Amino acid sequence: MDSYKTQWLTSEGDERVRCELLAFGTVEDLERGTLNAQDRNVLVKLSILNYVYGKQVVTFDALLKNYAQAGIELTDNDIEMILLELCNHGIMDVSIDSVAREVKVLQLSRYRDVYCGERELLVVNPTKVITNIEIIDTLQAYSDKL
């Protein structure tokens, strides 16, 4: 199956918006585009990955607040189930402390498409996507530390 980005590059209309949201978006972008229930669930999972990217510890309150701002009500159990599903798929590895209500991010694999300016973004905020320039800068900073 092609990546959402590959589909986005060749699609038009509603399908383009759908693929753009799934390739680069988060739940915060939903107000500018609509998704069916299945795609919305995928975006909820992808949004967790976006939120934890670059963080070592994330609180349940922060995750729940992030979703609430997008009009999506989740429970602690919902968050735990999503995290466990992502771990089972090998996308990430976390340590969940249900009592302290926090998640320690142990490992996060490449998980989202990278925006390289191929087309204009219609619904996703371009300042919030992972770009090729950001990746190059991160690699350069890492290389400089060696």
UniProtKB/Swiss-Prot annotation:
Gene: CSN9
Keywords for the protein's UniProt record, in alphabetical order: Cytoplasm, Nucleus, Signalosome
All copies of domain PCI, residue ranges: 1-107
GO cellular component, one term: COP9 signalosome
Tree of life domain: Eukaryota
Main subcellular localisation: cytoplasm
The protein's name in its UniProt record: COP9 signalosome complex subunit 9
Subunit organization: Component of a COP9 signalosome-like (CSN) complex.
Localization (cell): Cytoplasm; Nucleus
UniProt cross-references to InterPro entries, sorted A to Z: Csn9_fungi
Chain's role: Component of the COP9 signalosome (CSN) complex that acts as a regulator of the ubiquitin (Ubl) conjugation pathway by mediating the deneddylation of the cullin subunit of SCF-type E3 ubiquitin-protein ligase complexes. The CSN complex is involved in the regulation of the mating pheromone response.
Lineage: Eukaryota, Fungi, Dikarya, Ascomycota, Saccharomycotina
Signal peptide positions (record): none
GO biological process, one term: protein deneddylation
